[in-house]
Amino acid sequence: GDAMEQQEAQRMRDEGQDELHQALLNILANREEELRATIQAIDTRQLRQILSLLRSCEVMEVVSEGGGLPVAFDASIRFSHLGKRCVSSAVHEKNLAFAQTLTPKDILIVLSASGQSARLEEVSAAAKGRDVPVLLITCDSHSPLAQLADYVMTASNREQRLIEGSHAASLLSPNVLIEVLYY
C-alpha cells in the first residue's frame, strides 16, 4: 500500500503544480490583452499634442488618490528626471492649493481608474478655471472627470470588464501610458 500512497501523493503534487502553472498563464494572458487594448486605444494625433504639451510645459502637477497614488508618484519621479518641475502629493488640500497656482503654460495630469472623485474633480476644475491643460488617464472615458479634461487617455482594465463597477484596477495600463508619455 505504501507505493500506491506515494503515487497518489505525487499525483496530487503534480496537479497542484499544473493549477499554479495555469494560474500564471491566465495572469499573463489577461495582462497581454490589457496592454494590447490600452496601446491600441491610443489616438496618435492626440498623443502628439500631449507629448508636445509635456515637452513645452513649465510645471506639471500629477494627482490621484487611493490605488492610483503609486502611479502618480512614479510619473512625477520620471518626469522630474526629464528636468521638469513636477509636483505630486497624497494630500488633497496641497493638490488643490497647487492647482490654483498653475498657469496655461503648465499641465495637470489626473489619474483615476473610475473617473469619479469629488476631490479630483475639484482639483481639475480649479486648473481648468485657470486655462491649464488637463490630461486624464482613466478606465472610463465617459466619466465626470473626463468631462473636465482636455485630453483623455483610456487605460484598458480587463478586471473592470469582467466585473463591471470594480475599480480594483490593475496599475499596469496606467503605468504603461505613463511610460508612453515619458518615452
Feature-to-residue mapping (PLM):
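A ubiquitous structural signal for well-ordered alpha-helices
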Residues: 31, 38, 50-53, 123
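HTH-adjacent hinge/linker in prokaryotic transcriptional regulators
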Residues: 1-46
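Glycine-rich phosphate-binding loops that contact phosphosugars or nucleotide phosphates
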Residues: 55-176, 180-183
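Short hydrophobic/aromatic-rich motifs at helix boundaries and adjacent loops
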Residues: 21-23, 46-49, 94-96, 152-154
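Glycine-rich phosphate/diphosphate-binding loops that line cofactor/substrate pockets in enzymes
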Residues: 45-57
